[in-house]
């Protein structure tokens, strides 16, 4: 079977280790925290010596344990709390090498906590471990994904909508500074997937777009920024999850492209990541028939893909990590022996085994494979050495604890918070304005307050002149809360109505009554990819999180039937939703449901900021990649309507 040959950057890969390539000095970068000394990723002689010495002293039991990474969900835990006892006991009993920081979940809710709570818990876990733990996290939008009080950034697609890769570099730097402050060393980001399938239920706005070169540019920029501030990076989900129609958290996804397609679309961003010095590559639970014809071999367990393609053909020398081993895309194949999934993943060439479905079974299966000779001691040593050197490269051989006294100086610096908001502002993309309503125009009976932003003027309050309908993913979440605050700060009598899949049908009469006399309507669609989550529809079916529920879709269509020309639809996430609602006349993409994107969308709709974003993806039948209607700040509906490539 022919393999992808990597020539263009072979010399770079030889001269500069994929794991320890130093970041370049870029003094002109946006958002750089000049007052904070940056710590680079570097494996010095002392670190290498520590790794060698530590490895020589380790037993097979300890070495096997270093391969595993387990959840730690941030919350305050007393030392005697059963959750803390179980977590610390697992670290000691199984000698785990790393933990993945997340937060508890309650249905659709992520129970986020504060940075101090995270840092304090991670310090206690470090104390419980014989060897220093490397702490990883999914900070795809910065720490704000998991923790309150941190710098907020939008989803990846918003960055590419700005057209400026330096924004991704600033994001990498700022999120790295904050992560290292709380004791997190390794981010499972950037996402190198090319979102070429509009129906993709799990990647979508997590990707930088549909163009392999643009995705590669932003991937490389993020890596540079993160490395400048000492954060390990991960390119995911190899060999590409962007052209799939199944969430691998819920089922078995397939990448059906041939060799030519893989080489032209899926692989180039990973090549860019490797040449940029990415520290790790995460392998996806997807089948790729063009690379491995065995239907029971997902990429994670395929030696042809992990060792043959990634390591040998593409020359990657860094750490290879699995996607979570508890995902349905893998557990359904190994339902009768989940421990075997760990063994097969390791034999394929992975170094780190993340979130096993059953830690005890996986640990015992790996240990038995080593003792029986199925896995050689030299192969085990190879991976453990990589892991130890990775730890030393971020200084864990010298210091493993976060300095809690530094958190108030490093987290959410005003200048960094401003960078996050600026990026969200620059990402706003106007796709359609047939009704000439963007920005919203004042009328004879305009609404507002003396403090409201132009073009509204202060006049007596008149109810329902502006109606905002927030189509929430779930009313229990905070979706739409910042949008509501920003609207009411400008139009104090605006009528804000929340609906979700369970309430939309019952709310339809009151919504229709509200919009009847409205000058303008805002319909904000909160449709974002949530990995591993399926939604029960009102009709009893199941859909994914990037689709609009039937009942909410019916309500949106009813609004459009009555008031399409005066309704501004805001896509607070998935930009493709307009495909199912051709009656939309005025369409704005924010590419994220982050609070900064909510603020940016309101500022744009009210004409307070220029609209300069351009689509990073093609919306079939609607608009092509690169298109976007530009507006100057405080312009009126008669302003420029040109589409810019």
Language model features: what each stretch is:
Residues 71, 90-112, 198-199, 274-297, ...:
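Short acidic, glycine-rich surface-loop motifs adjacent to enzyme active sites
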Residues 56-59, 83, 90, 109-129, ...:
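Second-shell residues forming the walls of enzyme active-site clefts
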Residues 54, 62-135, 139-142, 193-206:
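Short, well-ordered alpha-helical
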Residues 65-71, 97-102, 132-137, 141-143, ...:
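Structural recognition of the beta-strand scaffold that forms the well-ordered cores
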Residues 161-184, 191-200, 204-206, 212, ...:
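A substrate-binding/cap region within the structured catalytic cores of diverse enzymes
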């Amino acid at each position: 079977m022919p393999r992808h040959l990597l020539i263009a950057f072979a010399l770079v890969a030889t001269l500069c280790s994929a794991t320890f390539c130093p970041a370049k000095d870029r003094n002109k970068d946006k958002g750089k925290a000049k007052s904070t000394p940056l710590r680079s990723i570097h494996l010095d002689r002392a670190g290498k010596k520590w790794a060698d010495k530590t490895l020589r002293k380790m037993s097979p039991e300890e070495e096997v344990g270093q391969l595993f990474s387990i959840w730690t969900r941030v919350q305050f835990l007393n030392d005697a709390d059963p959750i803390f006892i179980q977590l610390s006991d697992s670290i000691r009993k199984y000698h785990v090498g790393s933990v993945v920081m997340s937060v508890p979940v309650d249905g659709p809710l992520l129970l986020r906590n504060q940075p101090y709570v995270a840092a304090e818990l991670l310090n206690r876990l470090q104390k419980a471990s014989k060897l220093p733990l490397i702490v990883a996290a999914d900070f795809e939008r910065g720490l704000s994904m998991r923790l309150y009080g941190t710098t907020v950034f939008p989803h990846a697609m918003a960055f590419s909508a700005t057209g400026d890769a330096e924004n991704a570099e600033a994001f990498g730097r700022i999120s790295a500074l904050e992560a290292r402050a709380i004791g997190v060393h390794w981010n499972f980001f950037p996402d190198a997937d090319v979102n070429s399938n509009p129906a993709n239920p799990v990647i979508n706005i997590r990707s930088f777009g549909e163009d392999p070169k643009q995705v590669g540019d932003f991937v490389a920029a993020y890596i540079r920024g993160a490395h400048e501030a000492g954060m390990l990076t991960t390119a995911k989900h190899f060999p590409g999850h962007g052209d799939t129609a199944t969430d691998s958290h819920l089922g078995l996804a397939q990448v059906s492209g041939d060799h030519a397609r893989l080489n032209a679309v899926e692989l180039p961003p990973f090549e860019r990541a490797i040449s940029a010095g990415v520290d790790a590559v995460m392998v996806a639970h997807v089948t790729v028939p063009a690379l491995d014809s065995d239907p029971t071999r997902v990429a994670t367990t395929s030696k042809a893909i992990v060792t043959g393609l990634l390591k040998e053909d593409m020359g990657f020398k860094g750490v290879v990590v699995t996607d979570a081993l508890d995902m349905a895309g893998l557990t359904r194949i190994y339902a009768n022996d989940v421990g075997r999934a760990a063994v097969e993943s390791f034999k394929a060439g992975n170094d780190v085994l993340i979130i096993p479905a059953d830690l005890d079974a996986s640990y015992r299966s790996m240990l038995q494979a080593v003792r029986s000779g199925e896995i050689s001691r030299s192969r085990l040593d190879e991976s453990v050495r990589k892991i130890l050197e990775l730890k030393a490269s971020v200084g864990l051989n010298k210091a493993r604890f976060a300095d809690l006294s530094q958190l108030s100086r490093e987290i959410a610096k005003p200048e960094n918070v401003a960078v996050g908001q600026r990026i969200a502002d620059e990402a706003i993309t106007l796709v359609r304005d047939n009704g000439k309503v963007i920005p919203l125009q004042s009328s004879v009976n305009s609404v507002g307050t003396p403090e409201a932003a132009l073009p509204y003027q202060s006049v007596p309050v008149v109810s329902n002149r502006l109606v905002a309908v927030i189509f929430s993913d779930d009313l229990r979440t905070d979706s739409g809360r910042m949008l509501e605050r920003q609207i009411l700060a400008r139009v104090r009598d605006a009528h804000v109505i929340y609906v979700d899949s369970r309430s939309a049908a019952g709310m339809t009469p009151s919504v229709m009554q509200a919009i009847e006399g409205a000058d303008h309507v805002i319909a904000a669609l909160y449709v974002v990819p949530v990995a591993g989550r399926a939604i029960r529809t009102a009709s009893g079916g199941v859909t994914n999180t990037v689709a609009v529920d039937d009942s909410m879709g019916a309500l949106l269509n009813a609004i459009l039937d009555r008031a399409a020309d005066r309704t501004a639809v805001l896509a607070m996430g998935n930009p493709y939703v307009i495909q199912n609602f051709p009656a939309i006349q005025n369409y704005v993409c924010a590419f994220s449901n982050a609070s900064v994107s909510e603020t940016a969308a309101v500022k744009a709709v009210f004409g307070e900021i220029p609209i300069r974003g351009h689509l990073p993806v093609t919306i079939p039948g609607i608009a092509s990649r690169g298109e976007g209607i530009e507006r100057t700040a405080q312009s009126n509906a008669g302003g420029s309507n040109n589409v810019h490539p």
